[in-house]
């Protein structure tokens, strides 16, 4: 398993603050009939689908649950752990604590496009477009916390493993 740990240069952890760990799954979700992957458009930008893991839930269970709950696709063909984990250490001013975010990356393929109601605008893109579009948005979402440290090698590795 490849692990990348990034310490924010913009919001570095503070020695005297409580540390809270949050784990989440991020998923490269493949279209059932085309070589395209989904992006979701949220209020802060475009990203791959990602979600917090609930207590007592396995990583795979979180991926399956959230695909159904958040992007509303009903039939998942397969889920594969990409064995890549990105850990981000930063100070969260709003909560006045150090936040340790652990993101586990997955690939999932849909059986079909049957879905329920849309919560997000889902965009289907080819691998290269996903790589080019997600990078600025991930950086924005993380408030530039790891922009200087997450190099192109790691972004390409995420796409390559899916």
Stretches found by the model and what they are:
Residues 20-22, 32, 98-101, 117-119:
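A generic fold-level signal
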Residues 23, 44, 102-104:
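Residues that flank catalytic or metal-binding motifs in active/ligand-binding sites
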Residues 34-74:
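Conserved Nudix-box catalytic region and its N-terminal flanking loop in Nudix hydrolases
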Residues 73-113:
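Active-site segment of metal-dependent pyrophosphate-handling enzymes
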């Amino acid at each position: 398993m490849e692990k990348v740990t990034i310490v924010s240069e913009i919001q570095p952890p503070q020695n005297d603050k409580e540390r809270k760990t949050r784990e989440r799954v991020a998923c490269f979700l493949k279209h059932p009939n085309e070589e395209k992957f989904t992006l979701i458009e949220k209020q802060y930008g475009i990203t791959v689908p990602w979600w917090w893991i609930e207590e007592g839930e396995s990583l795979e269970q979180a991926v399956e649950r959230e695909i159904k709950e958040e992007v509303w696709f009903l039939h998942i063909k397969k889920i594969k752990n990409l064995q890549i984990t990105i850990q981000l250490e930063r100070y969260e001013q709003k909560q006045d604590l150090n936040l340790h975010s652990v993101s586990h990356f997955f690939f999932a393929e849909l059986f079909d496009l049957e879905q329920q109601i849309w919560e997000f605008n889902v965009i289907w893109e080819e691998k290269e477009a996903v790589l080019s579009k997600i990078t600025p948005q991930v950086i924005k979402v993380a408030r530039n916390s790891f922009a200087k440290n997450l190099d192109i090698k790691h972004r390409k590795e995420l796409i390559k493993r899916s």
